[in-house]
A protein has these predicted regions:
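Ligand-binding clefts/hinges and TM-proximal coupling segments of bilobed small-molecule sensing domains
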Residues: 9-22, 150-165, 205, 234-279
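A ligand-binding cleft/hinge motif common to bilobed small-molecule-binding domains
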Residues: 81, 97-106, 153-157, 178, ...
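Ligand-binding cleft/hinge of the Venus flytrap
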Residues: 44-47, 61-68, 151-168, 196-197
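Acidic, polar ligand-binding/catalytic clefts
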Residues: 58, 71-135
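Extracytoplasmic small-molecule ligand-binding "clamshell" domains
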Residues: 12-97
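Short loop->beta-strand "edge-of-pocket" segments that line small-molecule binding or catalytic clefts
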Residues: 30-36, 133-148
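Periplasmic-binding protein-like
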Residues: 38, 115-123, 189, 193, ...
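Extended ligand-binding regions for polar small-molecule ligands
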Residues: 58-67, 127, 134, 149, ...
Length: 279
């Protein structure tokens, strides 16, 4: 997996796109810069056991690179500011499970949606008081979520800012629920299933769907690469490859936890660090 741009390779947003023998765009081996947080299960993370970058984003975009003759160059970026960085042209594309919204579409372009999702309420497995969003509205509860996300926006709009505790990373929000520092979280169902797989004895999803949205890849406005990725997504849907990758990462069988990923940072609250971290 490439981690940084070389000084000689041609950027994919500057190449002449031809058609390959498979009928898909051929990008001639160019480098395609891709922003990843590397801290958002199951989309992208660094496996602490072997130091290898893994996740849905990696599997999908690596396969696209094989289909359309480009080299993904994954560049770590903080979620807070990622969308603006894409809008400013710092990256050719961003993953990280970005929800397609009209507000975001004003400053960036989106690919076709690759997953339909719903927002759900997540609570500790032993919690019997909270069974729906109505319980959160009517009770004295604290809801943890990640700042800058549609989950945060929904929580504030439905519950009021005083009830919402915002974290820089979603894993902190989930750990707050597990530890009892927060009563619930508002989370995308796909990510929630991943957390349930990783913490089957600690968290659960309750209530029905709160919203219906789609996730898409984010690009600078006017990027010629949007159509390239859309064709790649369509090909992966037709071949069954996308469904195969979705089943791998978006189900309770996904068992990677935040204790299994390399994310030791002195800025992370000590109670949320993996046990073997020394910072």
């Amino acid at each position: 997996v490439a981690a940084a741009c070389s000084t000689t390779a041609v950027p994919c947003d500057e190449v002449e796109i031809t058609t390959g023998e498979n009928g898909l765009p051929d990008l001639g081996g160019c480098e395609f810069t891709f922003a990843v947080e590397n801290a958002y299960l199951p989309f992208n993370y660094i496996d602490a056991a072997d130091g290898v970058a893994k996740g849905w984003d990696y599997d999908v975009f690596n396969h696209m690179g094989e289909l359309m003759n480009f080299t993904p160059v994954y560049i770590p970026a903080a979620w807070d500011g990622m969308i603006q960085a894409v809008a400013d042209g710092q990256f050719m594309v961003a993953g990280d499970g970005i929800t397609i919204t009209a507000e975001r579409d004003e400053i960036i372009d989106f690919s076709d949606g690759y997953i339909n999702l719903a927002q759900r309420v997540l609570v500790a497995v032993g919690n019997t008081e909270i069974t729906s969003i109505d319980d959160l509205k009517n009770g004295d509860y604290t809801v943890a979520t990640q700042k800058g996300t549609t989950n945060y926006e929904f929580a504030v709009s439905e519950l009021g800012e005083d009830k919402v505790q915002a974290f820089d990373d979603f894993n902190f929000a989930i750990q707050a629920v597990i530890s009892g520092d927060a009563d619930a979280s508002i989370i995308d169902e796909t990510a929630g299933l991943g957390y349930m797989g990783a913490n089957k004895d600690q968290v659960k999803l309750v209530g029905g769907d709160l919203t219906s949205e789609q996730l898409g890849f984010a690009f600078p406005n006017g990027s010629p690469l949007v159509d390239v990725v859309n064709q790649g997504l369509a090909a992966m849907k037709d071949s069954g490859k996308l469904a195969e990758i979705n089943a791998k990462f978006f189900s309770p069988d996904f068992s990677v936890t935040y204790d299994d990923i390399a994310e030791c940072d002195e800025n992370i609250p000590e109670e949320y660090l993996p046990e073997d971290c020394e910072v």
